[in-house]
Regions:
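Charged, low-complexity intrinsically disordered terminal segments
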Residues: 1-396
Length: 396
């Protein structure tokens, strides 16, 4: 199990308005190296600002490396922006750039969904924010709401090693000569604060369930309050049982979920689970004010997480994800205040009585969606009985 490390400084960044200036400032201060991983690198106002900063760094001799997901690159990284980065001296790789629709393979679903950057092995950024403007929300009401953290201290060591290892792996499978070891030596980073934290990833080899396990460990020991904000929420059986058990032992459990429909199938499949959760006393607040993209949580005013991982089959079973977990009352309180304000000002609560009275057609649609997702995951070989059990208690 990955241990918490003391001596860190973790700064909460709220959406692009705080994240992009902090990231640009760190890039502009870089002296030796910049490593960046992202799912989306858009050719828009925000993406171009960061791209220009990366090129400036490369032009002054900084080793700049960008790893972008192949699907994200296909849909957002324009040829113009890609050319500008490469021509400016940025070393750019694409993770799984398979895009041919007639060559379907299960592995194509294993995307690079994490959003990480480290500069000079002294400061890092981890979170759920892609390199895309908050106001650039196709088919959704802007702005996009999300979180990231700026990190200094010993927890940088696994961040650096993780990024080096994946870069070397991508070069290896793409038959490129790599100057990065596949198994890098750990670095030593001096303490810079008083906060205890750990960096946790999900991959398809050694760390398949680590993010989920970190969540479950905190939920199962919660004593007072659990607040989870997640844009795409379709948890497996163990996760649901942990939330229900917490609510039944008197813990206040609140889920802040996206109300607006982005992916219809996942949206309605998620709602098929509402009845079971509501019956146990879990509070569900759907965010209507704008586009919720957050993947964060606070438990008992002392534990918090910020990262890229949703609580759904894609994030917990297939994609490469990364979260920071923090044990610190001050940080947890900061994030909790943000979430409670979002709940107070931008949500509608799902009332158990009204939910039970929804139309038969609505019930059928949600369960068909859930069934389609279940069958699809089974065909792909993911999930098994733990995620979609064949027999379960009746869920209303």
């Amino acid at each position: 199990m990955i241990r918490f490390t003391p001596g860190n400084r973790i700064e909460l960044l709220r959406s692009g308005g705080e994240f992009f200036p902090a990231l640009e400032a760190a890039i502009d201060a870089a002296e030796s190296e910049i490593w960046l991983e992202t799912y989306i690198f858009a050719d828009d106002s925000a993406g171009c600002v960061i791209a220009a900063a990366l090129v400036r760094a490369a032009e002054r001799g900084v080793d700049v490396r960008v790893l972008v997901d192949g699907w994200g690159a296909k849909h957002y990284l324009t040829k113009r922006l890609e050319h500008a980065l490469r021509a400016g001296g940025v070393r750019l790789l694409k993770y799984r750039p398979e895009v041919a629709p007639w060559q379907f393979r299960f592995q194509r679903l294993r995307r690079l969904h994490r959003k990480i950057c480290h500069v000079d092995q002294r400061v890092a950024f981890v979170g759920g924010i892609n390199l895309i403007d908050d106001m650039n929300t196709p088919h959704q009401k802007p702005p996009r709401l999300d979180f990231a953290v700026r990190v200094t201290g010993p927890v940088l060591a696994p961040i650096v090693a993780t990024m080096q290892r994946l870069w070397a792996l991508v070069e290896l499978v793409q038959f490129e000569r790599s100057d990065v070891p596949l198994f890098p030596e750990p670095i030593a980073v001096a303490p810079s604060g008083t906060q205890t934290a750990k960096f946790v990833i999900r991959d398809n080899l050694r760390y398949r369930r680590d993010i989920e396990r970190a969540y479950l460990a905190a939920i199962r020991t919660a004593k007072r309050e659990i607040v989870i904000a997640n844009a795409y929420f379709l948890p497996g059986l163990r996760f649901r049982h942990a939330l229900i058990a917490a609510a039944e032992r008197g813990v206040s459990v609140t889920l802040l979920l996206q109300a607006r429909v982005e992916y219809r199938l996942l949206h309605y499949a998620s709602r098929a689970l509402y009845g079971q959760l509501l019956s146990a006393g879990v509070v569900i607040a759907e965010y209507h004010r704008s586009f919720l993209h957050a993947k964060v949580a606070v438990i008992d005013d002392r534990w918090a997480t910020v990262g890229s991982s949703n609580i759904d089959p894609y994030s917990l079973l297939m994609a490469r994800e990364a979260n920071i977990f923090v044990r610190d009352p001050h940080f947890a309180d900061q994030l909790r205040i943000e979430l409670l304000q979002m709940i107070d000002t931008g949500t509608q609560h799902v009332e158990p009585e009204r939910w039970a009275e929804r139309s038969t057609l609505t019930k059928v649609v949600t369960w068909i969606a859930y069934g389609v997702v279940r069958v699809g995951m089974g065909v792909l070989g993911y999930g098994g009985h733990e995620w979609f059990p064949r027999r379960r208690a009746r869920e209303r």
